[in-house]
Amino acid sequence: MKRPFTIICIIVSAFVLMAGCRIKEAEQVDENLKEVSSLKDIEGKWEGDIKIPNQPLPIIVHFTKEDGTISIPVQGLNEFPLTSVKLSKSDLFFDIKIQNQQITFEGKVDQEKISGTFAQNGQEYPFELLKKSNQEVAEKESGEVVQADLKKGTINGLLETPKNEGPFPVMIIIAGSGPTDKDGNTIAIPGKNNSLKMLAESLAEKGIASIRYDKRGIGENMKLAGKEEDLRFEQYIDDAAAWVQFAKKDRRFSKVGIIGHSEGSLIGMAAAKKTETDIFISLAGAGEPIDQVLVKQLEEQLTPALLTESKDILTNLKQGKQVESVNADLYSVFRPSVQPYMISWIHYNPIELVKELKIPVLIVNGNRDIQVAPNNAKALHKEKGDSELLIIEKMNHVLKEAPADREGNLATYTNPELPLSPGLVNGILEFLNKHDITSNDDPLK
């Protein structure tokens, strides 16, 4: 039986793990819903998610006075035109149609909130949208939009520069795992932390430029989204390397470094190895290959039988072999379409990569990081004897000061008002200054 066209893919947790689901066949629209000429009552940008169990799917809907668009960032769907929008008092219906197949949203408008039911192919899930204020919609990123050339196409980024004329050093900031944007926010998690945006702005204030970018398939780089089975870890490395090459050609920059956060640390190591990078900084980077990281995480979640099966699958993947038959309970992690990416990812060992770097290296971690424990940083530092190690008290995985309890720690992941953890920026600046990676008029020099 031929599988219907796939529209929605869900990325889970930290492993760019996607699960496909099929389009809903055309449904009859309630005849009582009357189409109106103006949708001014709901005009504007609305953000929220489809509440799929354990895997909320972020969506963005923009209504105009006559129609609208929908974006599903995880899928790479950007401002796709709505087929119809119908409003009757507080009852709202809108849909999209692709290849003559339909997805529907039906709900109620309650001032600044829309809630209702999303339906496709006989499956229904709740959805909720919140209206963005005019101030939020109008808010623009500071900095200069830039593009780097790839083997196929271009990748977009944001250049943040100091106020002085330069030349100044520039740091390529690489985001962590999953569907993460240039500011450090994961679209699969409601709310923002803006940690990488804060880092870029703080560096600019101290005379250090930076380039940060949405990962391929996310935000400004949705155009780079491809089929899941075609994704390879090397593509992320090539993206980072392209930014190094871009910066090397720009006369505004005196030196070029890389700052990699979480998975971005591994990507950054590999990119630094293949380019003429002057310095490398790891923020909350793992100290072991992803298969070992996965086993530790799965040990806390799976039954003994499922854990054994997971280990067997990982053994095969490490040998470059795909596993076609996967238990339904493990499908979201090990489905066949994601296995080529995992095979390519497992190939990279941060312990081996960090030893091969011939440039100054700073390894940073927080002692309240519940995703990547400080012993990872210590392991990297041990292998790279001439590296510098910085363990920051009370700092967690999103680079914020966090309480000791898990719930309070996780709450910082969605609070953009919290500043970066004290000691992070100064620690980075001291390291850069020590290795002469500073602006001409840097006050620390």
Predicted regions and their residues:
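Central antiparallel beta-sheet cores of small beta-barrel/beta-sandwich binding domains
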Residues: 28-106, 118, 170
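N-terminal cap/lid segment of alpha/beta-hydrolase-fold proteins
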Residues: 51, 130-166
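Short, surface-exposed "cap/lid" segments of acyl-processing enzymes
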Residues: 164-205
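Alpha/beta-hydrolase active-site loop
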Residues: 195, 228-250
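Primarily recognizes the serine-hydrolase "nucleophile elbow" in alpha/beta-hydrolase
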Residues: 245-299
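Accessory cap/linker subdomain of secreted extracellular hydrolases
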Residues: 279-353
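Short beta-strand/loop motif that positions the catalytic acidic residue
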Residues: 357, 363-365
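Short alpha-helix in the alpha/beta-hydrolase fold that links the catalytic acid
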Residues: 359, 372-383
